[in-house]
């Protein structure tokens, strides 16, 4: 398997969510997304410039430059509204911005030592194509850190609780705060439909990105992979 299921027009959807995105994510994750972002930053380690893919409102890039004050970052997202949100809230941040799909990065080969992709993998219609593009722009020996919302294993004691949370709480909170119940129903479905670890890691290998570290967070409700070119 190299492609995920067909996606709706999520570019328009994420543009519409930009004003309330951080607030809703904070509520839905009980604030844990901050710790998860920091865990990704810690596992990536320090470099002078980070390529942050599917950057959204820039929370990972902000965490990165706060942890490594000498660093800067290039933020890539296909949602103009998301990137405008970062620029308005953090005008002095050491960021440059590119509005682009990850499958067609307007960047030269072998440029970046570190790249990140948080909560973006499950939104890709063509993950193998996107990961091959990331491989192209990474330096030899460079690393990509992926943080994604995942499902606990079926034998995990929290599996049923997590399923109920996705089915009942996530769409309700999203509808209440954003007025967009469809978007948060999509969030539920994108987590449910994300392939399990073995299938994902087969895609990583097909893109010539070798998993060198994996960390499960909160009983497997989120997962970090560090991949090496």
Curated annotation (Swiss-Prot):
InterPro entries: SAM-dependent_MTases_sf (IPR029063), UbiE/COQ5_MeTrFase (IPR004033), UbiE/COQ5_MeTrFase_CS (IPR023576). CDD domains: AdoMet_MTases. Gene3D superfamilies: Vaccinia Virus protein VP39. One of its GO terms (molecular function) is methyltransferase activity. It catalyses: a 2-demethylmenaquinol + S-adenosyl-L-methionine = a menaquinol + S-adenosyl-L-homocysteine + H(+). Its EC number is 2.1.1.163. S-adenosyl-L-methionine binds at residues 57, 77, 101-102. Pathway: Quinol/quinone metabolism; menaquinone biosynthesis; menaquinol from 1,4-dihydroxy-2-naphthoate: step 2/2. It is an enzyme of class 2 (transferase). Keywords: Menaquinone biosynthesis, Methyltransferase, S-adenosyl-L-methionine, Transferase. The keyword Protein transport does not apply. GO terms for biological process: menaquinone biosynthetic process; methylation. Methyltransferase required for the conversion of demethylmenaquinol (DMKH2) to menaquinol (MKH2). Belongs to the class I-like SAM-binding methyltransferase superfamily. MenG/UbiE family. This is Demethylmenaquinone methyltransferase. It comes from Chlamydia trachomatis serovar D (strain ATCC VR-885 / DSM 19411 / UW-3/Cx).
């Amino acid at each position: 398997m190299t492609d995920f299921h067909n996606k709706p027009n999520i570019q328009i959807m994420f543009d519409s969510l930009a004003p309330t995105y951080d607030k809703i994510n904070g509520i839905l994750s009980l604030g844990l997304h901050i710790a998860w972002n920091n865990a990704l930053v810690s596992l990536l380690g320090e470099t002078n410039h980070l390529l942050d893919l599917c950057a959204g409102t820039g929370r990972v890039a902000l965490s990165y430059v706060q942890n490594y004050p000498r660093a800067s970052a290039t933020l890539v997202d296909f949602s103009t509204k998301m990137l405008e949100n970062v620029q308005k809230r953090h005008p002095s941040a050491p960021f440059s911005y590119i509005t682009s799909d990850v499958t067609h990065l307007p960047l030269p080969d072998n440029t970046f030592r570190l790249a990140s992709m948080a909560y973006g993998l499950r939104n890709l219609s063509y993950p193998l194509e996107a990961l091959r593009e990331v491989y192209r722009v990474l330096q030899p020996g460079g690393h990509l850190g992926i943080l994604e919302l995942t499902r606990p294993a079926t034998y995990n004691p929290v599996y049923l609780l997590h399923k109920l949370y996705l089915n009942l709480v996530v769409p309700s909170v999203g509808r209440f705060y954003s007025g967009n119940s469809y978007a948060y129903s999509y969030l539920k479905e994108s987590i449910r439909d994300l392939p399990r670890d073995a299938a994902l890691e087969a895609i990583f290998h097909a893109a010539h990105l070798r998993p060198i570290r994996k960390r499960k967070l909160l009983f497997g409700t989120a997962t970090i992979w560090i991949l090496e070119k």
